Amino acid sequence: MNFAIEYTSAYFSHLAITPRKKVLKHSLVSVQSGLVLIKLGKQEYAVEPGQSVWIPYDCLTSLTYFPNTQVNRVDFSVRLTDSFPRQAGYITQTNLSSALLEKLEQTKARASKANNTEQAFKDMLSVLKQEVLSFKPLLCESALSQRFNQWNIDDSNLPQEHTLVMVMREAKKRMQSGQKRSLVIDDLFSGKEEEFEQLCMLVFGEDL
């Protein structure tokens, strides 16, 4: 069943990449741990722990969830007639919205044990919606975002673990676009197939 407002908490143990397409809902994404990259236009923006981003309906985007990333997400249906922010970007949580997200997480964990939490859950989401309506999303390229946007295979000033994820993401992208696996391994991993397979299991949790 599709609800007008839905809260989800998700943990990504391995690298996950969403297809680049226009989204069908408004979404508030808050990073608890790990790292998320959001692609808007030709730029990518790093969302670090403690940061949140707003993604409006019909926004063309792709999200990259790095391994060991925990996010909270609230989706708002386009059926809602409220005037949600139309621009994507970082948002500053209010004290109330932060407290609500924390309480939603706690309530979600108990929801399966008690039926009387459902109405309280809906009430909190309704209050959170009012907070969201006042958000003013801004796009600004942080130092980390800039390093990701400048990154290329031959030159990286990112931490080693981030570089590894970017190389593996590039490998997957090339193979999805039709490049032969052996050619990708030759180009990105100096022909070391065993090393490539080990890294696939480490980063993706499966072979490519």
Show which residues each predicted segment covers.
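Short acidic-glycine-tyrosine-enriched beta hairpin
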Residues: G41-Y57
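Basic/polar phosphate-binding segments, predominantly the helix-turn-helix DNA-binding elements
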Residues: F148-D154, K172-L208
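An amphipathic alpha-helical interaction segment
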Residues: Q93-I153
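Short, Lys/Arg-enriched anionic-surface-contact patches
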Residues: W151-V167
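A cytosolic small-molecule/anion-sensing beta-strand core signal
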Residues: Q32-S33, E48-P49, P67
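Short beta-strand segments in beta-sandwich/barrel cores
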Residues: S27, S33-K39, S52-V53, T61
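Generic protein-terminus/edge-of-domain signal
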Residues: M1-L35
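Ligand-binding loop in jelly-roll beta-barrel domains
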Residues: C59-Y90
